[in-house]
Amino acid sequence: MQKINNINNNKQMLTRKEDLLTVLKQISALKYVSNLYEFLLATEKIVQTSELDTQFQEFLTTTIIASEQNLVENYKQKYNQPNFSQLTIKQVIDDSIILLGNKQNYVQQIGTTTIGFYVEYENINLSRQTLYSSNFRNLLNIFGEEDFKYFLIDFLVFTKVEQNGYLQVAGVCLNQYFSVQVKQKKWYKNNFNMNGKATSNNNQNNANLSNEKKQENQYIYPEIQRSQIFYCNHMGREPGVFKSSFFNYSEIKKGFQFKVIQEKLQGRQFINSDKIKPDHPQTIIKKTLLKEYQSKNFSCQEERDLFLEFTEKIVQNFHNINFNYLLKKFCKLPENYQSLKSQVKQIVQSENKANQQSCENLFNSLYDTEISYKQITNFLRQIIQNCVPNQLLGKKNFKVFLEKLYEFVQMKRFENQKVLDYICFMDVFDVEWFVDLKNQKFTQKRKYISDKRKILGDLIVFIINKIVIPVLRYNFYITEKHKEGSQIFYYRKPIWKLVSKLTIVKLEEENLEKVEEKLIPEDSFQKYPQGKLRIIPKKGSFRPIMTFLRKDKQKNIKLNLNQILMDSQLVFRNLKDMLGQKIGYSVFDNKQISEKFAQFIEKWKNKGRPQLYYVTLDIKKCYDSIDQMKLLNFFNQSDLIQDTYFINKYLLFQRNKRPLLQIQQTNNLNSAMEIEEEKINKKPFKMDNINFPYYFNLKERQIAYSLYDDDDQILQKGFKEIQSDDRPFIVINQDKPRCITKDIIHNHLKHISQYNVISFNKVKFRQKRGIPQGLNISGVLCSFYFGKLEEEYTQFLKNAEQVNGSINLLMRLTDDYLFISDSQQNALNLIVQLQNCANNNGFMFNDQKITTNFQFPQEDYNLEHFKISVQNECQWIGKSIDMNTLEIKSIQKQTQQEINQTINVAISIKNLKSQLKNKLRSLFLNQLIDYFNPNINSFEGLCRQLYHHSKATVMKFYPFMTKLFQIDLKKSKQYSVQYGKENTNENFLKDILYYTVEDVCKILCYLQFEDEINSNIKEIFKNLYSWIMWDIIVSYLKKKKQFKGYLNKLLQKIRKSRFFYLKEGCKSLQLILSQQKYQLNKKELEAIEFIDLNNLIQDIKTLIPKISAKSNQQNTN
């Protein structure tokens, strides 16, 4: 463990001291790397440095050039005494572009191009602006015209823009080194060999076998299109499938061919079109199937013919299925269906508004008619058995497929099955119609299995995509429910038709009105695609969801509405930093919340920690409460938005944390080599293959900037993460900027607020008030609107701070307000002022979500209609704030069942170890990263919360562990996890846990407590978290009956090796327990069934002398 810590410390030390010049010298592709000053001395372009001014000399020493060849001698032979250029710098640059030809260069030509709504400006480019500077003009005079032209072509030129940041202004694009994005393991395999020796002839068969494994692993199986089953409103008169489905494809194709033939033969009277017949339906099926399902996977013509015979049987069997009978048998309508139908009809035909209570009861009755997973599975199994011959997959494989259907039906919204989830449980030798392979070598048999698995994957996808999914889409409406997470529910289409009719009535009564397309302005109608409305069942009502992801093919609009608003979103992203400082009190993320909260804590401590009062409020339906005309007026009058913006894409090449190998060797520090050898099983490293992906990470981002922004402001807007990092980085400005004006954004907002049309069941609606919630600019617009409103009504807070010296903190995250102050009167005045703001601007506060920590007479302030809740602990947006210490902790109210319904387990058997490791790390960081702030919470407070964060992490990780233990390793040896010499889930889970904890602690300690935390506290944190995490994992798995036999053996091993994660850090653990910085109470131990803290402490005390003696003996040896 100490060895790993030393490696990490050396790694951090090296990355902090290095600069870009040192890093580029390690790139094997660059044969020459130097600063510009040394290059000019080597080429004898300059001799006396005293003639150069200080600013230009600094420019030469900080500018780095690099090339794939050493061209110093070439530049010595030309223009030893160059004449001063008579051309402008712009003309020389344009000439260099002509010389460059087809090569990629960052110097752009001048011109404008109109694209859609926008205009591209090729001459406004950060790299080009830098080349137009006086420094490059002086450089042109030193080189001469011809040399300077070739200099821009031959060299990569990086100019310094920040302390450790550079801008590439010329040369070939660095992005070419990242053109092939390969995974790290694959990159290592290409750059390391076994002891530096070539493969011998004796091992040729093994080499062929490994190549076949690579081909099999690299093969991409077709996808199961499960996402298509959701939200299909289409309903036919009779149960079955769509007319455009595979089974009706031959009839459609037949009619289409007759139509084409008639059009071609129009005017040719000498040909009788009645005698011309289209292809036979079986011929059409053959043509389409062989194109769609990769006929190249079939090994011979015999297999192709057999496959087509099976499909013809499937089509014939499908047309003979009685869907009415199967639906009545497995998924019948409720007995009171006719009664529900008559009630809905009565409400729809009624001219008066429907009774609220009767509508709620009717909605609940309709929602209660959902079909269970078991009923749906039995219905699908019966169709597959009647339609598909079991010989197509093999009898045993067919049984496996039917069993897997239940998993397909009950999966959550964003989960999907992989073809490998079926294949790894199937046997290709069970398929009798495959051409058999007898008396062949092992390598040929393996290739046979690999090829047949590909065919088996095509067959599985064919059955699911062409039979299962169309049947579900046509006969059922599949959706989520409100407050049910990602769990899905099935409804019969006749039931959902009643729900839709009742929904249209309620929509007209609320914030939507029917609209005709004739009333929409032609400009807005032609340019913007329409959105789509769907509903999610909610108790007694529904929740409308507007989506803007579809494109309008009829109007030839190739972009959806969110894509059209992408540039406007970039402009509004700049407002996030200004809102809350110049207008209102908006916050957008946990980073802004933490910064404001930390500033308030510092003021509170400086004032002597006075008593605090808080208020939380919630705006009711904030998006629907926005006044559309006021929003447009606020936008036009605001000086925060400039008249013109340029949209450009920047690339960031940021130095990663991998150490420089050459520096490690010269300083006799082998830590970097140790890290690399551990990752590649001690295979020697090829120094000649180090390239940019080894030392740099690539990021890209689009930003919006105005003409008044300087270079530093542009970089800060695009890459905020580089401000807090001291590693070297390179910024590249490659694209041609495009322009967007304030008038264009105004037209977008006008369409959104006044002419935005959405469709529901072929009925067009328009919002009476407010803006849609599903757009990419809705959140910023909402915060901007309410920020302008609250600015007028909160002026008294600024006056109170100046007059009384009170300290106040007011934040609003979209619609949730939080106010903390040392003055109770300020809190009361805020409630009154915000209520006045709501009354004057047509919105309301949710009267059941107002909380304070003090009581007051509501009648005196005209607030008697509010149901104010008094709580000593402030709870706001999932955070709990202790008003005595102002420490923040998370609120975990979800049960394990609710979490299981929310978490989507979208992982495959392939690369399972890395997927689970990354998932566990992200889950824990999401739980703790926002609270690991030394300016807000103390380390002792974090230790007290550690158990709760660990428990919440494991509860969310539990569905993934269930997926792990469901894998049948006996039937799936190829996809089992290799851990040393054993294939066990126990060691696999230990491996995931150990390295995840290592990464998490390194990230947290390095980023937040770098200056004040020491190695002992880091060890305490890591070992304590490991101990709690592992025990909770086992306790949860122990409760599952299907793992009982396995876990009994596992628990025995764990009890014997209880101190697996404590041996190296038990001294630190005993220290923290003796100082009482962290203790588990009885409530915290309820979830851990077999742990006794007192016994554990005694065990640690008895174990320490043994470990100490053993370690001393090892040191002596």
From Swiss-Prot:
Intrachain S-S bonds: none
Effect seen on changing residue 539 to A: Does not affect reverse transcriptase activity
Effect of residue 623 to A: Decreased reverse transcriptase activity
Keyword field contains Coiled coil: no
UniProt region (CTE), positions on chain: 888-1117
Keyword Plastid included in the entry's annotation: no
Outcome when changing residue 94 to A: Decreased reverse transcriptase activity; does not affect DNA-binding
Effect of residue 237 to A: Decreased reverse transcriptase activity
GO annotation terms (biological process): telomere maintenance via telomerase
Mutagenesis or variant effect for residue 910 to A: Does not affect reverse transcriptase activity
Lineage: superkingdom: Eukaryota
Outcome following mutation: residue 1077 to A: Does not affect reverse transcriptase activity
Outcome (variant: residue 334 to A): Impaired assembly of telomerase holoenzyme, which can be rescued by TAP65/p65
Reported impact of residue 538 to A: Does not affect reverse transcriptase activity
Span list, region RT: 520-887
Result when mutating residue 882 to A: Slightly decreased transcriptase activity
Locations listed in the record: Nucleus; Chromosome, Telomere
Recorded consequence of changing residue 174 to A: Decreased reverse transcriptase activity
Region ranges (TEN): 1-191
Oligomeric form and interacting partners: Component of the telomerase holoenzyme complex, composed of the catalytic core (the catalytic subunit TERT, the telomerase RNA template component TER and TAP65/p65), which is associated with two heterotrimeric subcomplexes: (i) the replication protein A (RPA)-related subcomplex, composed of TEB1, RPA2/TEB2 and RPA3/TEB3 and (ii) the CST-like subcomplex, composed of TAP75/p75, TAP45/p45 and TAP19/p19. TEB1 and the CST-like subcomplex are tethered to the catalytic core by TAP50/p50.
Family: Belongs to the reverse transcriptase family. Telomerase subfamily.
Known role: Catalytic component of telomerase, an essential ribonucleoprotein enzyme that copies new telomeric repeats onto chromosome ends by repetitively synthesizing the short telomere-repeat sequence 5'-TTGGGG-3' using an RNA template component TER. TERT is a reverse transcriptase that adds simple sequence repeats to chromosome ends by copying a template sequence within the RNA component of the enzyme.
PANTHER family noted in UniProt: TELOMERASE REVERSE TRANSCRIPTASE
Protein name: Telomerase reverse transcriptase
Gene designation: TERT
